[in-house]
Regions:
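Secretory-pathway glycoprotein ectodomains that are cysteine- and/or Ser/Thr/Pro-rich
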Residues: 1-162
């Protein structure tokens, strides 16, 4: 006999920010820069994560250069900024693999939360990033430990190809 117990809480039901998030496009060539546009009618704190085709997650923001991402009311924010490291992706390095489907996950809150506790920051190289990445199940478990009713979560899928 298997018994399951769960606490089910709808996301954003107690004041999750009305965040608008979108990628510059839905399809990218390998290593082509990815841009994320964010906008909210209220002051919003944001964490941004990359969810790879291998089901591994790393944190893009906040990071060493940008300790806090805040969207001011009614103002649009484009990331990364010109002076920040670019966000890029490529298909998994498996022989014959020409494309993958991945996603950027945006977690928004009306107040600061410990975004760094959800996943480690992307590294300075692919090898370093892969060693830091954690399985999607661990990321989502850590995310659920926060009050999901006060969060807004946007999943921005894209296709990356050679």
């Amino acid at each position: 006999v298997v018994r399951l117990r769960a606490r089910v809480t709808p996301v954003g039901t107690k004041g999750g920010p009305a965040l608008s998030a979108r990628l510059s496009k839905s399809e990218y060539k390998a290593n082509e820069p990815i841009q994320i546009e964010l906008e909210s009618p209220t002051r919003t704190y944001v964490g941004i994560y990359a969810w790879g085709a291998d089901n591994m997650v790393v944190r893009l923001y906040p990071n060493e250069a940008t300790s806090l991402v805040v969207i001011e009311p009614g103002k649009s924010r484009l990331l990364p900024r010109p002076y920040e490291a670019q966000i890029a992706s490529m298909p998994m390095p498996i022989e014959g693999n020409m494309e993958d489907h991945e996603a950027i996950i945006v977690v928004a809150s009306p107040m600061p939360i410990k975004f760094a506790s959800l996943a480690g920051a992307a590294g300075k190289s692919l090898a370093q990033t892969m060693s830091i990445a954690l399985p999607g199940t661990k990321f989502f478990s850590a995310l659920a430990a926060n009050d999901p009713s006060r969060l807004t979560i946007r999943v921005l899928p894209y296709r990356v190809h050679q």
